[in-house]
Amino acid sequence: MLLRFTKMHGLGNDFMVLDLISQHAHVQPKHAKQWGDRHTGVGFDQLLIVEPPSHPDVDFRYRIFNSDGSEVEQCGNGARCFARFVLDKRLTTKKTIRVETKSGVIELRVQNDGQVCVNMGAPRLEPAQVPFQAEQAALTYRVDVEGQSVELAALSMGNPHAVLRVDNVDSAPVHTLGPKLEHHPRFPQRVNVGFLQVLDRKHARLRVWERGAGETQACGTGACAAAVAAIRQGWMDSPVQLELPGGKLSIEWAGEGQPVMMTGPAARVYEGQVRL
C-alpha cells in the first residue's frame, strides 16, 4: 500500500511526518530505518507519527523514530512540526493542542507569526530520571572517557541529555567525543550530547550529537537541556537565545519544578507517497 507523508524541518532538523489517523497502517522500526536512508529512502533525522489519543484529555498521540529504527521518547523540533502539520492537514482547528508522548504530555501552541511555542514540561534532574549512573544529584559530573575526564551536566527533557561547556563550538569534538558519550555505560539508555559555547548572559551557540541520528542541524530538547544547564550553573539568564547550525531557538525557564518553554519555526518542504 501507498502512504501519504509530508517532509518537514525545524531549523534543518528534518522529518518525515505520517498521518495515521486518516490513513491506517502498522509502521514498524524496520520501516523507519528503510525510509530514513538518505540514499535509498526518503531520508530524515526522525520519523514523526500522528495517531489518535489513548486518553480523552489529549488531542493526539505523538510517536518518534530515529533513522536507525529506534523509537525515542521526545523530539522538540519535531513537536513544532507536529503542531503545524495537524493544523495544515485540518486534523484540528485548535491553535493550542495537548499531545501525549512516551515521556508524558506536552502542550503545543501555534502563534500568529507562524512560530510554534512548545511547553516541554519540567526538566528531570535526578540521575535515576535521566537515567545516569551517579551516587547523588549534582550540577555537574565527572565522566571518564578513554582516560580523559569530561565535566558535564546530565538531565532529562523526556529524553536523556549530557551538556558540556566548550570555548568554541566550531572546534568542539562533536564527532569524536559525541558518539563515545552517547554509548557510555553510565548512560544505560544512551544519551544526546550538547556542546555549548556561552557568548553572554542571554546568548549561546550549540551543537548536538543526537542519540541514534548523529549530529543534526538543530535539536529542540538539546537546546532546552543546554539552557537549563546554563541557567542552573549561573552562566545565563532566562530567556535564552540559542544559535544552532540550522538557526535560532528561544528558551524560557523560571527554575526548578517549572516547565521549559521553547519557541521556534516549523516548515513544510514537500508532500509524497511511500510504499509500505
Curated annotation (Swiss-Prot):
The lineage of its organism: Bacteria, Pseudomonadati, Pseudomonadota, Gammaproteobacteria, Pseudomonadales. Keywords: Amino-acid biosynthesis, Cytoplasm, Isomerase, Lysine biosynthesis. Its main location: cytoplasm. Belongs to the diaminopimelate epimerase family. The record marks H161, E210 as: Could be important to modulate the pK values of the two catalytic cysteine residues. The gene is dapF. Substrate binds at N13, Q46, N66, G76, N77, N159, N192, E210, R211, G220, T221. It comes from Ectopseudomonas mendocina (strain ymp). This is Diaminopimelate epimerase. Coiled coil: none annotated. It catalyses: (2S,6S)-2,6-diaminopimelate = meso-2,6-diaminopimelate. It comes from the Bacteria.
